[in-house]
Structures are given as structure tokens and as C-alpha cells.
UniProtKB/Swiss-Prot annotation:
Record key words, sorted: Ribonucleoprotein, Ribosomal protein
Originating species: Methylobacillus flagellatus (strain ATCC 51484 / DSM 6875 / VKM B-1610 / KT)
GO biological process, one term: translation
Name this polypeptide is given: Small ribosomal subunit protein uS10
Gene name per UniProt: rpsJ
InterPro entries recorded: Ribosomal_uS10, Ribosomal_uS10_CS, Ribosomal_uS10_dom, Ribosomal_uS10_dom_sf
GO CC terms of this entry: ribonucleoprotein complex; ribosome
Subunit structure: Part of the 30S ribosomal subunit.
Job description of the protein: Involved in the binding of tRNA to the ribosomes.
Protein family: Belongs to the universal ribosomal protein uS10 family.
Length: 102
């Protein structure tokens, strides 16, 4: 039978939060005896918005805003029951989106 693995994908607007969360997940998994591959930084998604400064005229005058979405990917190979329980109880910051696939 193939080795079981857990794939964790993290998304956040702040790279410091995502790196801190990735470090907590890696430490928790290693403490319970699982092998961790990653965190692998995935490409940052940049969404840009152009807004007219004036409500009436001056089409050439615009403000530009952007949202950067940072992503990290990690695999936990051969997780034990203790690993899964520890990951479920882990308290991560509010700005981090966690996606777990078994």
C-alpha cells in the first residue's frame, strides 16, 4: 500500500503570519514523529486594481492598489494518530487560511 500523506496549503496576505504558522505546523508534526517536506513557497498571487481619483473627469488620473496573496505548501509523510490530533488542536492566527487534504 502507498504511504499515506497529508498535504497542507496555507494562504495569507501577510508573509510573516504564514511563515510563523508554517513553522508551528512543522514543529508540531516533527514532535509527534512524522516526516515533514516543506514548507515550499508557491508563487505569490498579485491582484491589482485601478480606481479613478476624480468622481467626474480626469480619466488619466488614477490610484493603483494591489493585494498580494502568499502561499506555502507542505507534505506530512506517514502521519500517526497523534500527529492528526495535534494538528487539529493547533491554534493558528486569524489571517491564515489552512487547506488540508488527506
Amino acid at each position: 500500500m502507498a504511504a499515506q500523506k497529508i498535504r497542507i496549503r496555507l494562504k495569507a496576505f501577510d508573509y510573516r503570519l504564514i511563515d510563523q504558522s508554517a513553522l508551528e505546523i512543522v514543529e508540531t508534526a516533527k514532535r509527534t514523529g512524522a516526516v515533514v517536506k516543506g514548507p515550499v513557497p508557491l508563487p505569490t498571487r498579485i491582484e491589482r486594481f485601478d480606481i479613478l481619483r476624480s468622481p467626474h473627469v480626469n480619466k488619466t488620473s488614477r490610484d493603483q492598489f494591489e493585494i498580494r496573496t502568499h502561499q506555502r505548501l507542505m507534505d506530512i509523510v506517514d502521519p500517526t494518530d497523534k500527529t492528526v490530533d495535534a494538528l487539529m488542536k493547533l491554534d493558528l492566527p486569524a489571517g491564515v487560511d489552512v487547506e488540508i487534504k488527506l
